[in-house]
Structure formats: C-alpha cells, structure tokens
Swiss-Prot record:
Acidic residues bias (residue ranges): 25-35
Protein name (record): NAD-dependent histone deacetylase SIR2
Cofactor note: Binds 1 zinc ion per subunit.
InterPro entries according to UniProt: DHS-like_NAD/FAD-binding_dom, NAD-dep_histone_deAcase_SIR2_N, NAD-dep_sirtuin_deacylases, Sirtuin, Sirtuin_cat_small_dom_sf, Ssirtuin_cat_dom
Residue ranges of domain Deacetylase sirtuin-type in the record: 185-476
Keywords: Metal-binding, NAD, Nucleus, Repressor, Transcription, Transcription regulation, Transferase, Zinc
Binding-site positions, NAD(+): 210-229, 292-295, 420-422, 445-447, 462
Amino acid sequence: MIISRGSHVDEEPVAKKPRISVGEMTDDTTDDGLNTEEIRAPYTTEEMDEPEKAALLPKIPKKSPVSIGMNPENGKYVLPNYSKDESLNARKFLKYYGLRKFLDTYLPEELNSLYIYSLIKLLGFEIRDKELLSSLYRFFHPVKSSDQFKLEYEDFTDPLEKKEAVKLIKDLQKAINRVLATRIRLSNFYTIDHFVSKIKKAERILVLTGAGVSTSLGIPDFRSSEGFYSKIQHLGLDDPQDVFNYDIFMQDPSVFYNIAHMILPPENMYSPLHSFIKMLQDKGKLLRNYTQNIDNLESYAGIDPEKLVQCHGSFATASCVTCHWQIPGEKIFSNIRSMELPLCPYCYQKRREYFPNTGDEEYDTLKGNLESGIQNNNFALKSYGVLKPDITFFGEALPSKFHKTIREDIMKCDLLICIGTSLKVAPVSEIVNMIPAYVPQVLINKDPVKHAEFDIELLGFCDDVATVVAQKCEWDIPHKDWEGKLKKKRFDVNEIERGVFNIEAGSPE
C-alpha cells in the first residue's frame, strides 16, 4: 500500500508526493467571519534592507532533508534526528517559497507514509493519535550514539495500512496549516535595545491591549486565577462567560446586571500604560490602538477616537435593546451600582403593560416576572425596553469599525505591541498572525502567551514595563505619577531566555 499523488490510496508499487490541500482542515476562519487566509500579509517587502531580508530568508537544503533508511539486519527503519535550526528553516522555507516548492524540496519523488511522518516531525509537531503513534514505532529502530550499521535507502514497502496513511496525510495538512498561520520569530530582533531602537524609528505602531492594562486601577482581568470569571463561579453558571451571552441577556438581563457593578470602570482615571499609548500618539507614532477592554479608559487618557478601535465595545454608551435609543453610558451607572435594570423612557409605558405591578423601585417583583416569563417561554418580554451597555456580548458581531480598519492597518504597521492580553478571544487574537512576517512583534504582559510567537517578551506589570521603555527612550510619559514616582524609579531587568525578559520594581536606593 502506498500514498498516491491525490489524497486517496492506490495499490501500486511506487509512491509519489501527495497533493496537500491547504485550508481543507484549518481553523483560519474565525468566529466573527474574519478569514485570515484572505488577508495574510506577504512574507517580505521591498522596503526591507538586506540584513532584515536575510534574517527571514531560509537556507535551501543541498539534499533532501527527509531521508529514511532501513537497517537490513532487523528490517526496521531509522528516522533522522532534526535540530531546532533545521525545524525552523523548514518552517521558513514553507512560508517563503510556498507549499509546492516545499514538498518538491523536502520529499523524494518516491516515498511512503514514513516520510510523511518524518516531515511532520521536521516541522516541529507530533501526532496525537496514540494508536497510530504506537503502530509507527513498531517499525522504527531506536538509535543510540554507539550504534554502527549501514542503512539501506532503496525503495521499500510501506509498513502502514491504508487508513493509517490517510490519517498521516491529514495530520500533515494540519501541521502545514499551522505553520502557514503562525509567524516565525525574527532572528535579528530579540533584545530590549532592539525594541528601543525600533520604537524610536517606527512611524506606524499598532498597539493591541487587553485587561492587563487596567488592573493597576483595581479593574479585574477576566481569565486569571484572581480574575472576574473566578469571582463569579459562585453564581452556579454552566460557563462564567454566560454573563456576557447575548441570548441569555435577552432572556434574563438580571443575570448581567447582578454582576455588572463588579466591572464598572472608574471615571476619569487611567494608568501610566494608557498614558504611554497617548505618548506614542503625541509623537505621531501610533497607527491605531485596538483595545479588547470595555472600560473606555483610553478616552480618558486622551486617545483620539480615530486612533482607537474598541473591539468589544465599551461602557461609553448604552442602547435600548428594543428601540435602540442611545445615551451616554454614565447615565445608567447608578442603576448598575444598585443592581437595577435601567429602562428606556420611550419603551417604559409599553413595558408596564407587560409588567403592570412594576414600579421603578420594585426590582424584586420585576425579576420575579422576568423569571416567570422565562418559564412561560415569553422571550419577547423579559428584556423589553431594557438599556444595555454597548459592549459586545458573545453572539454579537464586532463593531463595524474593527472590520473597516484592520485590513488596512495590518499592512501599514511597522511595529506591533501587544499589552496585557492572553489573546484567547477571536478574531482579535488572530491579528498577531495576520501581521506581515517582517514586522517585529513585542509582548508586554504579566505572563507569557505560549500559543503566539513574539520576538521580544517583556514580562511584568504593564505600568512597570512601560516605565522602563520610556526611561530607556528618554521620553516622558504624560501621567500625573511620572515626575514624582516613575521617571527615576529603579527596576530589575533579567533575561530569562533569548528574547524573554522579566521586569520587576527594584529596591530603592
């Protein structure tokens, strides 16, 4: 049994290279309909200088890197041992030259399924099917450094069954799609000095922010052990994220308004990190700030509306879910603090027809009627005339501004800085994989983001890292704490591994 040039299996004596259909088994289309394949950026650009291009270009192998020999003494096969550099080069080759040339270069013309498995390993992956893995290793010879025997590289029969070979082809498809969808770190951008030099020269910086930029103000993040979702587990919801589920809100808005006070943002406050972004704007360097936060603190810091994309909406405004009348968000803050349903004045009389015994202060009665409505399946009544903050719930589309700007911005930016985010929610989390490969990417976060490949990771409190960067750039952050507390504050900066630094406040002199 052999692997044919298509994805099916033939009973012929010689195998040919498989035709892999990239995208057939991929997750590139996000939940919000943003197809990263359609807007994937070029690998290099003519604007790059030669050292920058050289850092991205792969080496062309002198011979087929994937070669499998057989030990004639026991009939078992020997897999090559691939180094990290060989794996990195294979990934670069695939991304730069494309799939067809990659397969032509890395696989011999005649092959069997063991070559497919070896190529998966070369790309840095392992198959998860334990049964298939067990079948494979029955045919491999464990090689020790002291072993000396001559291998045969002539054609040999594929040891795997047809269904196992098909599984391997599908796993190779997944590995290829993952490589194409994930960036590769730049080899010439890995120190803080590199970052400082780049941020000084950059003219179109894309900043992506998450909850970590606001935690210093007492606003909880969402997914950490001390975050918001952990604090509401006592509510007994199947999923803590249900408090932001649009369908559940429409069925029973009290689920959200029982906890909304916990995430209500402070007014007219912002962190040094917010001011750091404002500083980039003032210096003409900020292309756009895409924030996943709903606290609207960027506006308090002075980020211009045209420079700000609130990907998940914000508390800045609130709208009636029935007639869509909109008001400034602070108009319902008192209701939120009192855990009351804010009601639209234009829909109020009609709502009283549905709930005739409900006064403004009779929240318990209203809640009881809402629960009764749920039991009776009268979904149109429960949220009738309720004002909802204009934050994007699960089940709602992202604001149109996100889609209008992101396609242009990812092609324009010359530096990406991700700050205070775990990059867990699509499609915003996909931005890092859509940026051109030659654009440096920097993470500023308390914890590493293991599923992304940043060139430089600055781990610590966001305000501390922003202060260190500003100090090294000899820039002043426009924040009330800068002159008195931050400008001369000392920090300990330790390199954990190449490109990864831990930053902590140092001991006072």
